[in-house]
Regions:
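Structural recognition of the beta-strand scaffold that forms the well-ordered cores
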Residues: 49, 71-73, 113
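Non-catalytic cell-wall polysaccharide-engagement segments
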Residues: 2-40, 57-58, 75-157
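Conserved alpha-helical segments that form or flank metal/cofactor-binding pockets of metalloenzymes
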Residues: 44-45, 49-63
């Protein structure tokens, strides 16, 4: 628990440096706290980068075309619960990882499957996943971690 708070402080500082001119500090730091607590096996910077690309950390964002909502742009019954939205995003990442492991693919596949669903992954990558990886690498460098590149997605057996 203490580790999550330290992570959230580092991440909040990095988010303010990276996005403080376009997103309110309160929204950035709230997102940092939630991300640090729900990240589990995922790098918090990766979840923050996804949330930034999906909604600019807006917990009330709604995509009328896809029916997704919240900072992580997911579908869940607990609409309006910001923590549940982030947890649903983590669950969606796990599902995407399982799909990509079966295909023998890595991080780009996971991010593409998160963004468009497993059915949307057709071997042709678009700019979205690469942008998320760049955002995550930038946040890692701003949090003061020694390794600046996003860590490889761990594969489950």
């Amino acid at each position: 628990m203490i580790g999550a708070w330290f992570t959230s402080l580092r991440l909040c500082s990095a988010l303010l440096a990276a996005h403080g001119d376009e997103v309110s500090p309160a929204r950035l730091c709230r997102a940092a706290v939630i991300v640090a607590h729900v990240a589990d096996e995922w790098p918090p910077e990766l979840l923050a980068a996804i949330s930034y690309r999906e909604s600019r950390f807006d917990p009330r964002a709604v995509n009328a075309r896809t029916g997704t909502w919240g900072a992580m742009q997911v579908s869940t019954r607990r609409r309006g619960d910001e923590w549940a939205g982030y947890r649903a995003g983590v669950a969606k990442l796990r599902e995407a990882r399982r799909f990509c492991v079966r295909r023998g693919e890595g991080e780009l596949c996971v991010l593409a499957a998160y963004a468009s669903g497993p059915a949307g992954v057709r071997g042709r990558w678009y700019r979205g996943p690469r942008r998320v990886l760049r955002d995550a690498a930038r946040l890692k460098s701003l949090t003061g971690r020694r390794h600046g590149a996003p860590q490889e997605v761990r594969h489950e057996a």
